[in-house]
């Protein structure tokens, strides 16, 4: 396990796609092996409420429309990205994210929030 605290991702951008999915991307972090996107329900402003997670080993991620929290026109949703120097383990992305998040691994600080507003 790496003892160095990885850098938080920079230049995170996101878009609510026409099909209802969300696409995020960010600058790759040197030596990062995985990233955990954290996100909130609609209109939650406190980062501590970003209790939903995804998992990716690249510097982009798409949340399927079926997994996006219900949003009405004008609703906001926030995303944060966290870097890990380890790869998650598990049968699916949720298990991989929980393995890192709940395990004894040192993730980065979270990125600045990406705020998306449903039109």
Residue map of PLM features:
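Recognizes extended acidic, P/S/T-rich segments that occur
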Residues: 27, 34-76, 86-94, 98
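Pro/Thr/Ser/Gly-rich low-complexity, intrinsically disordered linker/stalk tracts
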Residues: 1-31, 73, 88-119
């Amino acid at each position: 396990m790496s003892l160095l605290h990885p850098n938080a991702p920079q230049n995170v951008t996101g878009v609510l796609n026409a099909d209802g999915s969300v696409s995020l991307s960010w600058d790759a972090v040197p030596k990062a092996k995985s990233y955990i996107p954290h996100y909130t329900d609609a209109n939650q402003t406190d980062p501590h409420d970003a209790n939903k997670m995804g998992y990716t080993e690249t510097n982009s991620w798409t949340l399927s429309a079926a997994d996006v929290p219900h949003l009405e026109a004008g609703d906001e949703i926030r995303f944060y990205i966290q870097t890990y120097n380890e790869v998650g383990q598990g049968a699916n992305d949720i298990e991989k994210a929980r393995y890192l998040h709940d395990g004894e691994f040192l993730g980065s600080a979270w990125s600045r929030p990406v705020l998306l507003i449903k039109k």
